[in-house]
């Protein structure tokens, strides 16, 4: 008997259905702005929270009793986990999945064992992908869980740790390429510091940049055509991480000449931990030319840590999708659910409830964002606000037609006396509410 045998495939039944194991708003084939919902959303399920996390927290042991988490042969349990995962993906009807290397294969007791185990499981995942049609959105390497990475991976003071991390990324990037992955993600969970008293900031930044340059070189050497993505996060597990937010990552990439090689994977909960909105980080990524993909989840505003809950705010996601749609949508990226059920949600059905509800929220937000984009009054008002910069005077300033002195002389000669114009924030917020709630 399979783990999810008693659960039927999830189908679209419409908003009037009261079936908790059905989609009420997500109709994969429904067309929105010329593409299907499935094509717009590019939904992925993550391996780590869904099949690896045992339901523990810092105060208690694992609450889940998944068959693949029981004692036994490590590779056999990994295959059992993969079987359950692909059954889940197939029944949910999601086109993509994501993984860390050590999510899918046992790490073993040495680097050689790691490589051998991972190679076997990559073969098995390839078979499961071919049988199911489910594809890999992105792969990555876990460079944060093992104690060897306590002081970082690329930024570690020990070059042997750097070498171990490089080996994992080499194998994980090769595996992602072989499995047809469309992106490769680099999350520096331990690339930061606990105290400045023992930290050489310049050295660690240089090490991190060297590591990334090696990844870029390897990508091109093996012919991987997907995108390389850094996932920003300000802290946790370290006190301060070097990939703090989108702007910080972009500045780092520019400093080391990597801005044309690496983009960002934006997680909603990481944005809020950095003191930003999800909307801000996505808009900033597009403004800086580094938008890649999204981890869809949410945090708890009463908690100061990464709770990784399923997204449930149509309002928040509507603005996120508005930015994505008006910039042309995803290319290699997608909406990956970096989210987990709560520790008390121990039934197999709970995994479906979490994903089904979140996918419906994505669908609602996509449709509301499409309303904003179709008759883009927000953009019209935004362009009107900056219209004077498109006139001859504004263009002369931007094109270098003035020096600071000549501009000051011109302003004095003309007696410049600008008047303050309304930002119309309340009107703009009403437009958003009209799109979301159908208000008139």
Swiss-Prot record:
Entry keyword Transmembrane: no
Catalytic activity from the UniProt record: alpha-D-xylose = alpha-D-xylulofuranose
**Which sites bind Mg(2+) 2?**
267, 270, 306, 308
Which residues are annotated as active site? 100, 103
Signal peptide range in chain numbering = none
As to how many cofactors bind and how, the note says: Binds 2 magnesium ions per subunit.
Cofactor(s) listed in the protein's UniProt record: Mg(2+)
| Keywords on record | Carbohydrate metabolism, Cytoplasm, Isomerase, Magnesium, Metal-binding, Xylose metabolism
Kindly indicate whether the keyword Amino-acid biosynthesis belongs to this entry.
Answer: no
Would you tell me the protein name for this molecule?
A: Xylose isomerase
Its taxonomic placement starts with: Bacteria, Pseudomonadati, Pseudomonadota, Betaproteobacteria, Burkholderiales
Gene name as annotated: xylA
């Amino acid at each position: 008997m399979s783990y999810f045998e008693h659960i039927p495939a999830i189908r679209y039944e419409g908003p009037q259905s009261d079936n908790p194991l059905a989609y009420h708003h997500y109709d994969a084939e429904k067309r929105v702005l010329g593409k299907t919902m499935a094509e717009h959303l590019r939904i992925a399920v993550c391996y780590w929270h869904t099949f690896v996390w045992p339901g523990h927290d810092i105060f208690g042991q694992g609450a889940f009793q998944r068959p693949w988490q029981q004692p036994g042969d490590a590779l056999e349990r990994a295959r059992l986990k993969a079987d359950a995962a692909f059954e889940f993906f197939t029944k949910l009807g999601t086109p993509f999945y994501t993984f860390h290397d050590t999510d899918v294969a046992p790490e073993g007791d040495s680097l050689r064992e790691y490589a051998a185990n991972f190679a076997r499981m990559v073969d098995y995942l390839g078979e499961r992908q071919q049988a199911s049609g489910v594809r890999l959105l992105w792969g990555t390497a876990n460079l944060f869980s093992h104690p060897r990475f306590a002081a970082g991976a690329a930024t570690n003071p020990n070059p042997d740790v750097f070498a171990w991390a490089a080996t994992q990324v080499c194998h994980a990037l090769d595996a992602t390429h072989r499995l047809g992955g469309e992106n490769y993600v680099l999350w520096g969970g331990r690339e930061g510091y606990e105290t400045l008293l023992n930290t050489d900031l310049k050295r660690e930044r240089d090490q991190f940049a060297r590591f990334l340059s090696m990844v870029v070189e390897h990508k091109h050497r093996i012919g991987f055509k997907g995108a390389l993505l850094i996932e920003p996060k300000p802290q946790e597990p370290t006190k301060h991480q070097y990939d703090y937010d989108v702007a910080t990552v972009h500045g780092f990439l520019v400093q080391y000449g990597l801005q044309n090689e690496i983009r960002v994977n934006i997680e909603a909960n990481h944005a809020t931990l950095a003191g930003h909105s999800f909307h801000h980080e996505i808009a900033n990524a597009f403004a800086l030319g580094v938008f890649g993909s999204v981890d869809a989840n949410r945090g708890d505003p009463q908690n100061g840590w990464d709770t990784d809950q399923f997204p449930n705010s149509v309002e928040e996601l509507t603005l996120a999708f508005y930015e994505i749609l008006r910039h042309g949508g995803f290319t290699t990226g997608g909406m990956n659910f970096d989210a987990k059920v709560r520790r008390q949600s121990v039934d197999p059905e709970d995994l479906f409830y979490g994903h089904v509800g979140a996918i419906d929220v994505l669908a609602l937000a996509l449709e509301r964002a499409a309303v904003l984009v179709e008759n883009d009054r927000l953009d019209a008002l935004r362009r009107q606000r900056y219209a004077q910069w498109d006139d001859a005077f504004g263009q002369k300033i931007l094109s270098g037609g003035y020096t600071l002195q000549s501009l000051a002389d011109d302003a004095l000669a003309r007696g410049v006396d600008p008047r303050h114009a309304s930002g119309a924030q309340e009107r703009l917020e009403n437009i958003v509410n009209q799109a979301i709630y159908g208000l008139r």
